[in-house]
Swiss-Prot record:
Lineage, highest ranks first: Eukaryota, Fungi, Dikarya, Ascomycota, Pezizomycotina
Record field: compositional bias (Basic and acidic residues): 376-385
Catalytic activity: L-seryl-[protein] + ATP = O-phospho-L-seryl-[protein] + ADP + H(+); L-threonyl-[protein] + ATP = O-phospho-L-threonyl-[protein] + ADP + H(+); [DNA-directed RNA polymerase] + ATP = phospho-[DNA-directed RNA polymerase] + ADP + H(+)
Stored InterPro entries: CDK, Kinase-like_dom_sf, Prot_kinase_dom, Ser/Thr_kinase_AS
Cited PROSITE patterns: PROTEIN_KINASE_DOM (PS50011), PROTEIN_KINASE_ST (PS00108)
UniProt cross-references to Gene3D superfamilies, sorted A to Z: Phosphorylase Kinase, domain 1, Transferase(Phosphotransferase) domain 1
Named cofactor requirement(s): Mg(2+)
A cellular component term, taken from the record's GO annotations: mediator complex
Native source species: Aspergillus oryzae (strain ATCC 42149 / RIB 40)
EC class name: transferase
Listed SMART domains: S_TKc
Recorded name of the encoding gene: ssn3
Official protein name in the record: Serine/threonine-protein kinase SSN3
Length: 413
């Protein structure tokens, strides 16, 4: 429930007075990014409130040139509700929500980096691998936060590098809970109301196959994709998304499924018994028959991809602190398991030899790293948080919800 600040000098029950406004508490430094939800600004605390903050302003629904105050989107409500309740060092947490002039502002601690930004940095001006200890720390913290979400009965449903935030002290925060959803005893299948979840490159095969009763395993597949991308500096399954038609029918993502099959092999009922009952199984069969015999590998080529990745990245192919090694491949293969019932869980992943055998894991993923990552771009253009225009497009290279970070409001576990 959203609460405006009441004047303590006025008895309760007599109405709202002396509301705290965003600019009363925060100095707006500049504009960061925008998206379909609205805009994000960087701010500093005022009146003794120390720290840097990211303020996310939701835009009202608009019809033509007339603004219609018809309420908040389902995504915004979910994000506010969940962020207000969750409490974990590796999950985004909310500082406060401010209601001002029919606009909603979510205030978060400012985070300086995200994984998309870090990966991009390692491709410029030439490709240079992310250090193996950093990858290990990032993955451990990510799985630690994900375990908390899953034990709290929350599916994230949109894990991708842009939504994995990193503080200047190297702490990982899982951000953007706009698609997150509770999954215990659902009244309806999780498919209802949300026909498309998870950005296409990180979408689990059961989602591509039309599953309506998916599980936390969808998040673990996305973690596998992120792990692979940290090592290779490019998305492992970079397909092209087929858009919905005019009837809002969700199409079979043929190209994305092809990208997965090219590395993981053609899924069969022997390795994934439940696939034969999937709504899109006939489409998969059609895809397989549309290619010449032998076009798609019958078995996984993930290990070959992994070894090539280590070689190209300059990682040692043996074991040791300077390489993900054989343990890294084993964990990756368990994360990228076709059958969601066999896919490794967050708890199991945290206990995997990849983390157990490589020595201590730093809570600061930057520990030992001598380089520096660039700061976020903050502009003075259109930085009026109250009257700023609200375009529906986002800044190039600055993903939606890329600034979510840790905050102080807590609910004890």
């Amino acid at each position: 429930m959203l609460k405006e600040h009441l004047d303590p000098r006025k008895p309760s029950g007599t109405g709202y007075t002396s509301k705290v406004r965003v600019r009363d508490k925060y100095h707006i430094v500049g504009f960061i990014s925008s998206g379909t939800y609205g805009r994000v600004y960087k701010a500093l605390g005022k009146n003794g409130q120390k720290g840097e903050f990211a303020i996310k302003k939701f835009k009202p629904d608009k019809e033509g040139e007339i603004i219609q105050y018809t309420g908040l989107s389902q995504s915004a409500i979910r994000e506010m509700a969940l962020c207000s309740e969750l409490d974990h060092a590796n999950v985004v947490q909310l500082e406060e929500i401010i209601l001002e002039d029919k606009a909603i502002f979510m205030v978060f601690e400012y985070t300086e980096h995200d994984l998309l930004q870090i990966i991009h940095h390692h491709t410029q001006p030439h490709r240079h691998a992310i250090p193996a200890p950093m990858v290990r720390s990032i993955l451990f913290q990510l799985l630690n936060g994900l375990l908390y979400l899953h034990t709290s009965w929350v599916l994230h449903r949109d894990l991708k590098p842009a939504n994995i935030l990193v503080t200047s002290s190297g702490a990982i925060r899982i951000g953007d809970l706009g698609l997150a959803r509770l999954f215990y005893k659902p009244l309806n299948s999780l498919f209802s109301g949300d026909k498309v979840v998870v950005t296409i490159w990180y979408r689990a095969p059961e989602l591509l196959m039309g599953s309506r009763h998916y599980t936390p395993a969808v998040d673990l597949w996305a973690v596998g994709c992120i792990f692979a991308e940290l090592l290779s500096l490019r998305p492992i399954f970079k397909g092209e998304e087929a858009k919905m038609d005019s009837k809002k029918t969700v199409p079979f993502q043929r190209n994305q499924m092809m990208k997965i099959i090219e590395i993981m092999g053609l899924p069969t009922k022997d390795i994934w018994p439940g696939i034969v009952s999937m709504p899109e199984y006939s489409q998969l069969q059609s895809l397989a028959m549309s290619r010449a015999p032998g076009h798609f590998p019958r078995s996984s080529n993930l290990e070959g991809w992994y070894q090539s990745c280590l070689k190209n990245g300059g990682y040692a192919t043996s074991s040791g602190a300077g390489t993900p090694g054989a343990d890294g491949y084993d964990l990756l293969s368990r994360l990228l398991e076709y059958d969601p019932t066999k896919r490794i869980t967050a708890q199991e992943a945290l206990e995997h030899p990849y983390f157990k055998n490589g020595g201590p894991i730093s809570a600061n993923c930057f520990e030992g790293f001598e380089g520096k990552y660039p700061h976020r771009r903050v502009t003075q253009d259109d930085n009026d948080i109250r009257s700023g225009s609200l375009p529906g497009t986002k800044r190039s290279g600055l993903p939606d919800d890329s600034l979510m970070g840790r905050a102080s409001k807590r609910l004890k576990e």
